[in-house]
Curated annotation (Swiss-Prot):
Pfam families: ADDB_N (PF21445), PDDEXK_1 (PF12705)
Keyword flag Nuclease: yes
Ranges of biased composition (kind: Basic and acidic residues): 748-758
Residues covered by region (Disordered): 737-758
Functional description taken from the UniProt entry: The heterodimer acts as both an ATP-dependent DNA helicase and an ATP-dependent, dual-direction single-stranded exonuclease. Recognizes the chi site generating a DNA molecule suitable for the initiation of homologous recombination. This subunit has 5' -> 3' nuclease activity but not helicase activity.
Name of the protein this chain belongs to: ATP-dependent helicase/deoxyribonuclease subunit B
Naturally occurring in which organism (per UniProt): Limosilactobacillus fermentum (strain NBRC 3956 / LMG 18251) (Lactobacillus fermentum)
Length: 1245
């Protein structure tokens, strides 16, 4: 007769030792019998080691010990152990990855055949990973012993009908509809899935085969032990357990239970042991209902000497038991160092403290790294920081949380490859493919480097990055890859060697896509069956060297001892092979539809992606002596000594959340009502929440000696976190809670303190690198606060240098870094001369040739000037119509338009307003835009490659049209006439080519500034438009500068150097034409204003384009410049009639008729000359400082109203200069208009 016996006891007792005692005793009596020790798969390996070790000791064996008749197995491994010779068991197995692939295919078919069927999941079904979720749901149904036929919605006696009938009259019609729709979808997918995999064996199939084997086999000499199964079995596992109990000679089951519940009612659901008690009674009832099973009295563990944990952990158990009953046990009389609690500001700080404590405990000599277990409810929040932090602490760590394969290079490569094909070679897809590093074509001869292989990944990747920049700049992609003409980077002519190499790089990549990759991908589309497609794809990977590159990575990992990376490469290639095998076996005979030639490839791509999304890396420890990191919801072996529970916050300890998956908690509860007795789903909803204390309890008692709980106070998004009630309650129970501060009394300080005691300092002593970082931090704090370091810190410093003499140098270097400031070292004048005065022939001169805007940049921030014009840094070009490009286009178009009018003697701008000249006006505008576009072929190429850029050019055409018409309208309101456009000065000094109409450079002698003989500064520039106003015998010159924004003439900026342009233009004009009078400089904003319908081309529109700037204050000149300054008001100038409150020296006209509005200034010819002289001094001062090597990181700052303007506003090099705004090291501009006025008045005195 078969027997059943239970080993009962709470988690603090040593169940395994009792099980091993019984196993050893039985083995001595019947050594030839078979002994099966079943445990959860997660702890199989460690349990096997412990069982063999325990048997060796009990059987008094010496030397190496093995057992042929004792097997430690999981349920899945038990199937192989007993059924490996069964022919059906030898059928091809369908992995989880293969299952996901089949499900993905079914979902794709349903979308095509019955799109309304998936309406419940219409949005989700398009999401990556949906097939994996559906697969998990199907596996759950299979494990619950639910067959597709059971879910048929129209079956009167089926599960669905029974479930719906159970809630009849409950007023839940909407839930019933949603439930029915979901189950209909699942039924259809499940039904098709079962039909599709008949030639394969799935995991549930193997369980069914195992059950059949058990029911037929002779197990009279088999002894079964079940250990570590907490809570409940799945439906299929339960059937297997029932068969084992009935058929085996004897079965021993270990359960975590506080007492024997035979003949008793189950405890309340909030009892800590409720799930175990229910499992106990379920097994008892099943056994008693079977003939031939004798239930023996249980072995109840309740003696102190049977415990496996320390007294401190027994205290943890007592508190958890009481807390589950809503009781409050007495506090323990005195604190213990075997249980500790602490908080940290962030997860990073928390993990650092955990690592520090582990390191310190190992240093005592009482522990090895393998004695530590670190858990948290979910590792997601710590995943990216685990390895870096433990590595810094020099702690070997093994993370047993399975990592997904979806982000592996091969998975990314496969997804990107088929996306390239699907979306026709878009730049982002091509770059994602190439950046995986798996494609390494042969290097062209002109790019080969001595000592490098013909196929060099680094050489190719450099070319890929260069090509990406080119594509982003010019909008390349799609058909551009197949251009017959070579791509070209424009540059100096003739081409330099560097430019030739860059052009060779981008064409190498382009030609590889065009000549190698594209034909190979096109060949994939010729496949007529799934088998042929899989074969072609595999051959493609071989031909393109993908497998070779993976093997190369594996070899590098092996050479460097990176065993995890080595196994990752091996596993991903093995998974890929499994995917192809299962695809060919199941779908290999699928024929490509002739009416949709790309469908076979598209489906193959979807299935491969679904397969990789379902794939997980198998985790294998690289060494035995490692800290184990896991999740608290998983069963752990009980061999480790010290536990750290991280992330102990109230959102996860206990965790209250809905079940994951396609079925919601209400769906699951409703489905359970229709199940048969031999069918049941995993617990969910309220049952799962009620079981949370038990899961946390098992985690806390999974070690033998110490428990530490920690929590971060802030999440990764800086939201505040609340401590877990378990942490608070246990800390109070162990007299380690400070109610006044609402924190553990054993909490560690957030940062090192210079005056810390030896105990506090100890909490910051860890691995050398970490300890050194803490020491440097506290030394800096000591310096900043003036508090001296305690002797404990000085002892740490001495210990570090004694530990490793090499640390002394590093420590001193870092200490020196504390006093380092982010200051640029001034250039030597010789180096400055080489950087700034080298001409186009490569000769170092003593002449600074620059543009006015460059000197403005120097006044805004000298270091930015050095980076841009000394080192010639520039930001990465991207696909955009930048402000520079659009500004040039607008300026060129208006220049062509105005110049065309100037070139026609009988035509003036004002004439084009007349009706008879409207056609001519439109013709000139079109010609001007076309001529401007001809000057920027780059923009044409951008527009041809990108619809967004094309739209931007259409907007630019509208702007140019509006502004050309505005210029014509403005010409009717003034006596001034344009005489030149794009008037250049100093360009010959820069290009070496003189132009007949060009003005000489604006040049200043710098002799006497300590720069040597012949030192000078030569400025170049280009005046957008030059107007002349003739009044009597006098000719006045007026500078017009176009701006894309509302630019005002700021007197302070002009006086301080931030705005040199307009006065410098006047200086250049005066130097070239001293006989002509200067009228001033004006800005005109280029934009399309919003004007009421019917008011286009009227004075209303003119007022939207008023000029702002600086002009002389002669009333007669102003009236001639703007005819509207009479009764009707200004139509061109930002000027108004003077009021009594207008008294500023720079705002009022000479005869007190007019005053300037904000953004404009009216000055006397004398004051204009003073401003121009000051402008010249600013130019010379900037030039002298530049040539003397001045390059300090000191941007200007000026408060304008409520806004602080700084020299950082438009910098492209913030990451290079690393200016710390918190240090406030700006060059403050505190001048006001009144201050400038006061300076002028002082000069007059």
């Amino acid at each position: 007769m078969a027997t059943l016996q239970f080993v009962l006891g709470s988690a603090s007792f040593d169940h395994q030792q009792v099980m091993l005692d019984r196993l050893a005793a039985q083995y001595q009596q019947a050594p030839n019998d078979t002994y099966l020790y079943l445990v959860p798969n997660h702890v199989k390996f460690t349990t096997e080691v412990a069982v063999l070790k325990g048997l060796k000791k009990r059987l008094k064996q010496t030397g190496n010990y093995a057992q042929a008749n004792v097997a430690v197995l999981s349920f899945s491994r038990l199937g192989w152990f007993l059924c490996k010779d069964d022919p059906d068991y030898q059928k091809p197995r369908l992995s989880n990855v293969g299952m996901a692939m089949v499900v993905a295919k079914i979902i794709r078919e349903l979308k095509a055949e019955s799109p309304d069927l998936l309406k419940m999941f219409r949005g989700e079904s398009e999401r990556q990973g949906f097939a994996t979720e559906v697969t998990k749901q199907l596996v759950e149904l299979q494990n619950a012993n639910i067959q597709p036929a059971d879910l048929a919605p129209d079956q009167e006696t089926g599960i669905i009908k029974r479930a719906l009938a159970s809630q009849a009259g409950g007023g839940r019609a909407s839930q019933s509809t949603v439930f029915t729709d979901k189950m209909t979808v699942l039924y259809e997918i499940y039904r098709r899935f079962e039909a599709a995999v008949t030639t394969h064996v799935t995991a549930p199939d193997r369980s069914a085969m195992l059950l059949n084997h058990l029911e037929a086999a002779d197990l009279s000499t088999t002894h079964v032990y079940l250990d570590r199964f907490a809570g409940e079995f799945s439906a299929q596992e339960q059937l297997i357990v029932d068969a084992l109990i009935q058929r085996a000679a004897d079965t021993t089951v270990s359960l975590i239970l506080d007492r024997d519940y035979r003949g008793r009612e189950l405890p309340s659901q909030n009892n800590l042991y409720y799930r175990s008690a229910k499992q106990y009674q379920d097994l008892l009832n099943l056994a008693t209902q079977q003939v031939g099973v004798d239930v023996l009295d249980p072995i109840v563990l309740n003696q102190p000497n049977q415990r496996r944990v320390s007294d401190a952990l027994v205290g943890v158990e007592e508190w958890m038991e009481a807390d589950a009953r809503f009781a409050l046990p007495d506090r323990l009389p005195a604190p213990t160092d075997q249980v500790g609690f602490f908080t940290a500001p962030t997860r990073v700080a928390e993990l650092n403290r955990v690592a520090t404590k582990i390191r310190q405990l190992v240093a005592t000599g009482q522990y090895r790294y393998r004695d530590f277990l670190v858990v948290t409810r979910h590792l997601d929040g710590y995943q990216t920081m685990l390895e870096p932090i433990f590595s810094r602490h020099q702690i070997p760590v093994f993370n047993d949380n399975q990592r997904p394969m979806a982000t592996s290079p091969l998975a990314t490569f496969t997804a990107a490859l088929f996306k390239v094909l699907k979306d026709y070679y878009q730049e982002a897809d091509v770059m994602e493919l190439l950046k995986t590093g798996l494609l390494v074509p042969e290097t062209p001869e002109e790019l080969q480097q001595e000592g490098r292989a013909k196929r060099n990944p680094n050489t190719f990747m450099t070319a890929v990055y260069r090509t990406e920049n080119y594509c982003l700049k010019f909008g390349k992609g799609g058909r551009s890859w197949f251009d017959e003409r070579p791509w070209r980077l424009e540059g100096e002519q003739p081409e330099s060697d560097a430019l030739k190499r860059q052009n060779a790089q981008i064409n190498w990549v382009k030609n590889y896509i065009k000549d190698e990759l594209a034909p190979a991908l096109a060949d994939l589309q010729t496949a007529t069956t799934g088998r042929e497609l899989a074969t072609k794809f595999y051959q493609f990977l071989l031909d393109q060297g993908v497998r070779h590159q993976l093997y190369s990575w594996a070899h590098q990992a092996q050479e460097s001892g990176q065993l995890t990376q080595l196994r990752d490469v091996q596993q991903i290639w093995q998974t890929f092979g499994t995917l192809l095998d299962e695809y060919v076996t199941i779908l290999g005979d699928q024929v490509a539809p002739t009416e949709q030639p790309g469908q076979l490839v598209a489906e193959f791509a979807d299935l491969m992606n679904a397969g990789f999304n379902a794939g997980r890396y198998a985790q294998i420890p690289s060494t035995l002596d490692q800290v184990l990191v896991s999740e608290s919801g998983m069963i752990q072996d009980n061999q480790r000594k010290v536990l750290f529970i991280m992330g102990a916050t109230d959102d996860v300890m206990p965790e209250v959340k809905a079940s994951e998956g396609l079925l919601s908690d209400p769906d699951r509860e409703l489905l359970k009502r229709g199940l048969n007795d031999d069918q049941f789903l995993p617990i969910s909803g309220t049952d799962q929440i009620n079981n949370e204390p038990f899961l946390n309890y098992l985690s806390m008692l999974s070690v033998t000696e110490r428990l530490y709980m920690s929590a971060p106070l802030m999440s990764s998004d800086d939201s505040e976190l609340t401590l877990s009630p378990y942490l608070k309650g246990l800390a109070r129970h162990f007299n380690q809670w400070d109610d006044q501060n609402n924190a553990p009394t054993t909490d560690l300080p957030d940062r090192p303190n210079p005056r810390a005691s030896e105990d506090d300092v100890w909490s910051f002593v860890a691995a050398p690198a970490v300890t050194m970082g803490n020491l440097i931090e506290v030394e800096r704090l000591s310096k900043d606060t003036g508090r001296k370091l305690t002797s404990a810190w000085r002892d740490v410093a001495r210990a570090l240098t004694r530990y490793d003499e090499g640390l002394t140098g590093r420590l001193n270097d870092i200490r020196d870094g504390q006093y380092a400031k982010n200051e640029a070292v001034p250039l030597q004048p010789e180096l400055a001369a080489r950087l700034y005065t080298t001409n186009r022939q490569g000769q170092v001169t003593n002449q600074l040739t620059a543009s006015i805007s460059q000197l403005e940049k120097f006044y805004q921030n000298p270091y930015d000037y050095f980076l841009r014009y000394g080192l010639h840094l520039k930001k990465r070009d991207e696909l955009e119509v930048s402000s520079d490009k659009s500004g040039t286009l607008n300026h060129d178009a208006l220049a062509f338009f105005v110049q065309s009018v100037i070139d026609e003697p009988d035509l003036q701008l004002a004439d084009l307003v007349k009706e008879e000249h409207q056609g001519r006006q439109a013709e000139l505008i079109d010609q001007a835009f076309e001529q401007a576009m001809n000057q920027q072929e780059e923009l044409r190429e951008l527009a041809a490659n990108n619809s967004r850029v094309n739209l931007q050019l259409q907007v630019a055409k509208q702007l140019i049209t509006t502004m050309a018409k505005t210029l014509c309208l403005q010409a009717t309101q003034t006596d001034a006439q344009p005489v030149a456009v794009e008037k250049a000065f100093g360009q010959a000094d820069w290009t070496g080519e003189s132009q007949a109409a060009e003005l000489p450079a604006l040049t200043f002698d710098l002799t006497g500034a300590g720069l040597g003989e012949g030192a000078k500064v030569s400025l170049r520039g280009r005046i957008d438009r030059l107007d002349e106003l003739k009044l009597g015998e006098q000719t006045y010159q007026l500078v017009v500068d176009y701006k894309s924004y509302n630019k005002a003439f700021d007197l302070v900026d002009a006086y301080a150097g931030q705005a040199l342009q307009m006065l410098a233009y006047l200086n250049a004009l005066q130097a070239a034409n001293p006989g002509k009078q200067l009228l001033g400089s004006l800005y005109l904003r280029l934009y399309v204003p919003t004007v009421d319908a019917g008011k286009e081309g009227t004075a209303e529109e003119l007022k939207e384009h008023l000029y702002q700037g600086i002009t002389i204050n002669d009333d007669a000149v102003l009236a001639a410049l703007d005819h509207g300054l009479g009764e009707k008001g200004a139509t061109l100038l930002s000027i108004k009639k003077k009021s009594k409150k207008d008294t500023s020296r720079f705002k009022v006209s000479a005869d007190d008729q007019f005053s300037a509005k904000a953004g404009s200034n009216l000055v006397s010819p004398t004051d204009l000359k003073r401003l121009m002289d000051h402008n010249a001094e600013l130019i010379k001062e900037a030039a002298v400082q530049i040539l003397q090597g001045q390059n300090e990181i000191r941007p200007y700052r000026r408060q304008v109203g409520t806004t602080a303007e700084t020299g950082l506003a438009f910098s492209d090099f913030l990451d290079v200069s690393r200016f710390d705004q918190a240090l406030d090291d700006y060059k403050e501009i505190e001048l006001t208009d009144a201050d400038v006025e006061a300076k002028f008045e002082q000069e007059e005195e």
